[in-house]
Amino acid sequence: MEGEAVEAIVEESETFIKGKERKTYQRRREGGQEEDACHLPQNQTDGGEVVQDVNSSVQMVMMEQLDPTLLQMKTEVMEGTVAPEAEAAVDDTQIITLQVVNMEEQPINIGELQLVQVPVPVTVPVATTSVEELQGAYENEVSKEGLAESEPMICHTLPLPEGFQVVKVGANGEVETLEQGELPPQEDSSWQKDPDYQPPAKKTKKTKKSKLRYTEEGKDVDVSVYDFEEEQQEGLLSEVNAEKVVGNMKPPKPTKIKKKGVKKTFQCELCSYTCPRRSNLDRHMKSHTDERPHKCHLCGRAFRTVTLLRNHLNTHTGTRPHKCPDCDMAFVTSGELVRHRRYKHTHEKPFKCSMCDYASVEVSKLKRHIRSHTGERPFQCSLCSYASRDTYKLKRHMRTHSGEKPYECYICHARFTQSGTMKMHILQKHTENVAKFHCPHCDTVIARKSDLGVHLRKQHSYIEQGKKCRYCDAVFHERYALIQHQKSHKNEKRFKCDQCDYACRQERHMIMHKRTHTGEKPYACSHCDKTFRQKQLLDMHFKRYHDPNFVPAAFVCSKCGKTFTRRNTMARHADNCAGPDGVEGENGGETKKSKRGRKRKMRSKKEDSSDSEENAEPDLDDNEEEEEPAVEIEPEPEPQPQPPPPPQPVAPAPPPAKKRRGRPPGRTNQPKQNQPTAIIQVEDQNTGAIENIIVEVKKEPDAEPAEGEEEEAQAATTDAPNGDLTPEMILSMMDR
């Protein structure tokens, strides 16, 4: 069947191919259109055949990898179908020339293949029986070659004339028609009017297989055109593999669009620091961590950055790379050089306060100055309530707790906690050894000449723009005069409470005082429900009750050894302490009496004035307590005289007990004497109840008293005051 179909196609094509080519060329030259159908000799028994001409130059490459069936068809066409007379009449450029290259069946490189490229016009006759036959032959050859059934065949579109369609044929023979929207836009069809116009060839990469399909009268035929590349080694790529390659490709990086006039800045997430470079931000972030990777190999000190380590090493080696251009000074760091030039040469103050006219050379001093406006004191002592605006003053204050004295007098080797105190010591104690430089404008005496120049420049130089006093409206053009004027406001209590008579010198004290009126307690404990008006009280509460590692400070009295948690409490106790026995002196007794009298006075003021004097308790003033005589104990008669005992300090009289109504004031205030007592059981004759009576036993002299004395004693017992029973009366009752 295949051979008969091929012979019929070749016989019919031989007779009209040359004439058809000439007619088509003439019609295009004249602007005419091609006829829709060609009148060909038809055989009614075999069925009509229609021949469609594809007038284009196609480069065909014949290789050993082509299908054997197609090679056989081309061989038959070349051998037995062309007549000798037809070959002589047809031009050489219009004849299909096929050449078979026999190659060994072994793996060879693509570069060793010999390619034969012949431009041929392809004319394809279409028959009703040829489509099924070619499709069946193709499926048989695919099964013989052992190709994967799941591997689809790749189809690529080419610029096609009108009447053609692009289809995609799978491995199992399924045919899929591509829509017109999926194809690339075609060129304008006006090129058909000009026979000399040739459409531009489109460059395609790795075109493996293309299928052209056209239909006429319900008959369609697929034509495959193969194109092999020299660099391809593994055959045709499948459509699935192509999708995988596209899926694995990394998306392009988004381009950074920089807007003109906008400066890019980096901001720290932990504070308000901003910088124009990423490297500066990375260096700043190290300040929020304790990481110090760069270590000095000489002293072991660690630093956050290499620059700080390099500057530190210069201190070991004595290298000063930064030299001042205006003088002979040299410095370790560039910051020291800039600060030196501003102080000594340029006198530039770039950091200015936004609230007043203050300007500074260093930004740290500006921050400290701004805290004087806001009242902020972030640096607080952990041992007391002291708070400072800068770290320098806090360190100086901490020396009062630790006892450190880093400053030493070079003459007498006395040590001091502050440098100013040491300078004053030298000026006062060692005036003969110190050169004095007197200021011509004030009474200041300075030890060094350079310090005198600094003093004159800072204190007595004329300021064009006068400075205003921070406490009043006075304006001064000299800093020294301004400072002396502000000292007059030092002890002035400028801040006064609008709800009471309280006044203070500092604003922060007034803020804390007003909280006593409003009841505001903004500082709350995170572990309990306590709230406080001051942060110092909150910190003290937290350490005392919630910090397990807190050890309270112990202030020991040097006289008695008693410990206190506060220094002022210990100092007040030491003023009244008498010694290790814990007996307080005269000052202590007076202090306690005065405190008790003050409390009674405050209590008496709070009582209602409507109370009667009879019901009210008599209050004792301090004078009454002091004038009240102390009760003295009469000495007992001794039978034999004894030498007097050594003098002992007389203990102060104990405070009088509170008086009660209905009893004489004299008896309750008498101190109890330690005398021997005896318990006597007395039985009542009427009821028979037994009562225990405590009786004091007095020591009697060895000699028996006379009878007259007994009678006097019995008479004395009968005259007991207030009708109370005395031990003598009880004994006489028992005798009776």
Swiss-Prot record:
Chain positions with Phosphothreonine modification: 289, 317, 374
InterPro entries xref list: Znf-C2H2_CTCF, Znf_C2H2_sf, Znf_C2H2_type
Zinc finger (C2H2-type): 266-288, 294-316, 322-345, 351-373, 379-401, 407-430, 437-460, 467-489, 495-517, 523-546, 555-577
Post-translational modification (record): Sumoylated on Lys-74 and Lys-698; sumoylation of CTCF contributes to the repressive function of CTCF on the MYC P2 promoter.
Acidic residues biased stretches: 610-637, 703-713
Cross-linked sites for Glycyl lysine isopeptide (Lys-Gly) (interchain with G-Cter in SUMO2): 18, 219, 698
Comp. bias intervals (Pro residues): 638-656
Keyword Cytoplasm attached: no
Modified-residue entries (N-acetylmethionine), positions: 1
Skewed-composition ranges (Basic residues): 202-211, 593-604
Keyword line: Acetylation, Activator, Centromere, Chromatin regulator, Chromosome, Chromosome partition, DNA-binding, Isopeptide bond, Metal-binding, Nucleus, Phosphoprotein, Repeat, Repressor, Transcription, Transcription regulation, Tumor suppressor, Ubl conjugation, Zinc, Zinc-finger
Cross-link (Glycyl lysine isopeptide (Lys-Gly) (interchain with G-Cter in SUMO)), chain numbering: 74, 698
Localization, UniProt: Nucleus, Nucleoplasm; Chromosome; Chromosome, Centromere
Gene Ontology cellular-component annotations: chromosome, centromeric region; condensed chromosome; male germ cell nucleus; nucleolus; nucleoplasm; nucleus
SMART domains listed in its UniProt record: ZnF_C2H2
GO molecular function ontology, one term from the record: RNA polymerase II cis-regulatory region sequence-specific DNA binding
Entry's Gene Ontology BP terms: cardiac muscle cell development; cardiac muscle cell differentiation; chromatin looping; chromatin organization; chromosome segregation; DNA methylation-dependent constitutive heterochromatin formation; epigenetic regulation of gene expression; gene expression
Compositional bias (Polar residues): 667-686
Effect caused by changing residue 74 to R: No sumoylation
Family the UniProt entry places it in: Belongs to the CTCF zinc-finger protein family.
Protein name per UniProt: Transcriptional repressor CTCF
